[in-house]
């Protein structure tokens, strides 16, 4: 086990070095240097520490941004109002994902974007309804800015030769719907009064939700 030092280059081999950057939300961004190429792996950390990272990568020619993206289906969309009507999430507006990726790339002075950590779908019988908000693969390049190069996901990038980028010929896996009980969840379980306290204490721990969620009904 090797503990990597933060905000400095940690050399892994002759051509590869990494720099972890922790953020104020207790997440980490990983900057990867392969020869003269830079890969900024945000994963789901968001556009944090961009001023520092921009300085680190400013002298490199090819800078690739890897970031979670999409319409926003994975971000707490299962909400209802007091009349038990489903609240349509922001994901329903289907904002061009390429525009979002381009803006984030420019924040870090990256000139290439690669969709990353974004290729999920829902397979449980009690969550497959959310698949209508999942971003199709072809939508990730929609809205890409003219000065940003889009790289298809699952690509091979040759760091010794500019322009040598090729995508792997992958096929989408067939969706197999599974029952929630396979995951130890049973909607027929009877909840007790003490469970209400457990639920309330759980959500009360998230300070950021206090001014965003008006109420929690225990049903």
Over which residues does each language-model region extend?
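C-terminal, active-site-flanking charged/polar segments
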Residues: 139-147, 155-158
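Cap/insert and terminal regions of metallo-dependent hydrolase folds
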Residues: 52-144
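A generic short-segment signal for beta-strand/edge and adjacent turn/coil regions
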Residues: 1, 9-11, 33-37, 81-85, ...
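Short acidic-hydrophobic, aromatic-tinged amphipathic segments that line or gate anion-handling sites
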Residues: 2-6, 149-153
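Core dinuclear metal-dependent hydrolase active-site scaffold
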Residues: 4-62, 66-73, 157-204
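Solvent-exposed, charged interface segments at domain starts and junctions
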Residues: 1-2, 86-87, 213-219
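Noncatalytic linker/hinge segments flanking ATPase motor cores
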Residues: 23-25, 44-45, 79-86, 106-112, ...
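Extended non-globular C-terminal regions
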Residues: 200-219
């Amino acid at each position: 086990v090797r503990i990597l030092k933060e905000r400095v280059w940690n050399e892994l081999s002759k051509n590869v070095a990494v720099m972890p950057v922790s953020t104020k939300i207790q997440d980490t961004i990983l900057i990867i240097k392969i020869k003269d190429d830079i890969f900024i792996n945000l994963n789901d950390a968001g556009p944090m520490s961009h001023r520092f990272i921009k300085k680190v990568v400013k002298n490199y020619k090819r800078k690739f941004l890897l970031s979670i993206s999409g319409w926003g289906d994975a971000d707490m969309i299962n909400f209802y109002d007091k009349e038990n009507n489903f609240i349509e999430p922001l994901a329903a507006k289907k904002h061009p994902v390429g525009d979002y990726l381009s803006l984030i790339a420019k924040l870090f002075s990256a000139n290439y974007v690669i969709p990353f950590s974004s290729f999920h779908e829902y397979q449980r019988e009690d969550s497959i309804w959310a698949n209508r908000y999942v971003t199709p693969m072809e939508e990730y390049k929609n809205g890409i800015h003219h000065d940003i190069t889009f790289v298809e996901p699952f690509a091979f990038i040759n760091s010794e030769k500019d322009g040598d980028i090729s995508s792997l010929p992958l096929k989408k896996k067939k969706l197999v719907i599974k029952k929630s009980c396979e995951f130890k969840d049973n909607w027929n379980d009877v909840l007790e009064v003490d469970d209400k306290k457990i639920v309330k204490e759980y959500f009360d721990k998230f300070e950021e939700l206090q001014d965003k969620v008006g109420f929690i009904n225990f049903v």
